[in-house]
Amino acid sequence: MEHTFQYAWVIPFVPLPVTMSIGLGLLLVPTATKNLRRMWAFPSVLLLSITMVFSSNLSIQQINGSFIYQYLWSWTINNDFSLEFGYLIDPLTSIMSILITTVGIVVLIYSDNYMSHDQGYLRFLSYMSFSNTSMLGLVTSSNLIQIHIFWELVGMCSYLLIGFWSTRTVAANACQKAFVTNRIGDFGLLLGILGLYWITGSFEFRDLFEIFKNLIHSNGVHFVFATLCASLLFVGAVAKSAQFPLHVWLPDAMEVPTPISALIHAATMVAAGIFLVARLLPIFTVIPYIMNLIALIGVITVLLGATLALAQRDIKRSLAYSTMSQLGYTMLALGIGSYRAALFHLITHAYSKALLFLGSGSIIHSMEPIVGYSPDKSQNMVLMGGLRKYIPITKTTFLLGTFSLCGIPPLACFWSKDEILNDSWLYSPIFAIIAYSTAGLTAFYMFRMYLLTFEGHLHIHFQNYNSIKNGSLYSISIWGKEGPKPVKINFVLSTMNNNEKVSFFSKKTYQIDGNVRNLMRSFSIHFYNKETSVYPQESDNTMLFPLLVLVLFTLFVGSIGISGVTDMDFDILSKWLTPSINLLHKNLSYSPDWYEFFINAIFSVSISYFGILIAFLLYGSVYSSFQNLDLINLFVKTGSKKILLDRIKNVIYNWSYNRGYIDVFYATALTRGIRGLAQLTHFFDRRAIDGITNGVGVASFFVGEGIKYVGGGRISSYLFLYLFYIIIIIFLLIFWSLI
């Protein structure tokens, strides 16, 4: 067994030969490498599969024996300073390794078809393999120095992946935004690491945890400084895992190819921040203020991410905000000390979210031949609808992923989210109420996404649709429905009343004037004929196979953490994890009984079903029937109440669609402020600093010229100066005598 652990150091480096081979091939024999580009997918999947098998073997041994293995190499720089490099194999490492490799494999298989047409296919594979290497190196690190090295490599890979389509301006801006935002967290992490080393004199985890704990308990270090160092470490995790207030890069990162979105949101970049907090939790637990801060940031992110997802039209942005919210649950669990529940939800969410992202990729892939290859159209849920009869396999897998994220039993996320909700009651009823309420919001926006995409009719075939990007010719109601909107250009819509406002339940269709239609026809595509032969098609088998694999994970991975609800011992996760860090369940024999489990589950599931019901009433196939029968209007009479309700809906929509105005605040308070400061500094530098130096030079020039002119050897110049000084002296004498 120990023989197996001795070779665990190879785990991060197994996928690396693919990146190196592709790079050397493109450098030395570019033509042959590009001609055989599809061949590189096989070694990418093969090497990552070897890593997965090795990681699984280590995990099985840990489950059976609860072993923790660490190996260190000491590098002595001088007598007073030495660095230790090595690897650490503990339950957290094995969990993250399996998560990274399994999700990475299905994403690579999926990408072989999805990215086959892209000219950057080889670059895509090299980036993906190097990203897996960086993430595996991060989770196997045994000290803070290695953590920081691989942390920066993960950030670099994320920058390269987000900017994969760098020729598109929005993608280039997105990768820069992600890079700058994460540099804030990286700087905080570096300062925190240096501060901890100054306190403890060690970078290695075990020594650092023990020394730090003893210093805190014995008052051997200033408590404020120790809290500051721990806070700086947490800032790095906040930025990397897109937690409030450094979450603004996440929705813009959806400019990447969809397989990259699945990898980033499930197993790599956003999971790195959660891993860091879990790894350093022994430091955070001895400082209660930090634990409270972690829980507070988590619960704010939970609610913020859910509210921002309510009115999104882009299917990938909706999933991005969902990731932000679900990682908030994980951060909340870590903040309240529920270590097991946090890692459990990290596992279940990773597979469910990978399924949803790859499912959205299949949807986008089916829509692109119809609406074009612009993300503004192919990812717009308003142009979808009715896809269930065209892509039934994708529909089924996406529905299962949706139910899982909504917390519907017996799917994966139900078990982990329910455990977090229960533990939150023990920590803070206020946090618990927010977490439970957000569970209902999650069910609402996830089922809204499903209904807009798969139910009803294919919206793109509606009469009067055109593919113009400008929203002035068509508009979307606040909840994603198509509706009228006043046109502010010099077109005349014959039946539109510009004073009429968009109604929440309105389905009225306005006819476009013939002149306008003729003008539009010259630069847009029309789908007036509902019987057109162009319809979405189901994806190829190489894209459907990963979806089916992830469905199996979504169905059964939750069973590894079922605790106390059956007579059989299925709780593999508790055997896997070292439970001593869990502050809430210190009694290892504690587990909820059947009655307690069902009471808690019924409450949380009822909230989820309520959110699904609201979404179904607003977007389901019976929506038009409810409207025609005025069942909804029975509850909302015309008058002040309806006006108030419309205002509330508009406030919610504006908050969600404008990203909570946080980006606007950053653009106003930070971006413009920094630019103004830069302009002021530039002005001061040009006018003051350069003015002084240039003034000295100019003055020296004129003085020199004057001296040169006076001392040129001319008698006339000497006489002139002599008379000039005589006149000055006489003038001064006269002036002095008068005084």
From Swiss-Prot:
GO cellular component entries: chloroplast thylakoid membrane
Stored InterPro entries: NADH_UbQ_OxRdtase_chlpt_su5_C, NADHpl_OxRdtase_5_subgr, ND/Mrp_TM, NU5C-like, Proton_antipo_N
EC number: 7.1.1.-
Entry's Gene Ontology BP terms: ATP synthesis coupled electron transport; electron transport coupled proton transport
Keyword annotations: Chloroplast, Membrane, NAD, NADP, Plastid, Plastoquinone, Quinone, Thylakoid, Translocase, Transmembrane, Transmembrane helix, Transport
Enzyme class name: translocase
GO MF entries: NADH dehydrogenase (ubiquinone) activity; quinone binding
Membrane topology: Multi-pass membrane protein
Regions crossing the membrane: 9-29, 40-60, 89-109, 144-164, 184-204, 219-239, 258-278, 280-300, 327-347, 354-374, 396-416, 425-445, 542-562, 597-617, 719-739
Pfam families from the UniProt entry: Proton_antipo_C (PF01010), Proton_antipo_M (PF00361), Proton_antipo_N (PF00662)
Catalytic activity of the protein: a plastoquinone + NADH + (n+1) H(+)(in) = a plastoquinol + NAD(+) + n H(+)(out); a plastoquinone + NADPH + (n+1) H(+)(in) = a plastoquinol + NADP(+) + n H(+)(out)
Localization in the cell: Plastid, Chloroplast thylakoid membrane
PANTHER family: NADH-UBIQUINONE OXIDOREDUCTASE CHAIN 5
Subunit structure comment from the entry: NDH is composed of at least 16 different subunits, 5 of which are encoded in the nucleus.
Function: NDH shuttles electrons from NAD(P)H:plastoquinone, via FMN and iron-sulfur (Fe-S) centers, to quinones in the photosynthetic chain and possibly in a chloroplast respiratory chain. The immediate electron acceptor for the enzyme in this species is believed to be plastoquinone. Couples the redox reaction to proton translocation, and thus conserves the redox energy in a proton gradient.
Family in the record: Belongs to the complex I subunit 5 family.
Name used for this protein in its record: NAD(P)H-quinone oxidoreductase subunit 5, chloroplastic
Organism: Chloranthus spicatus
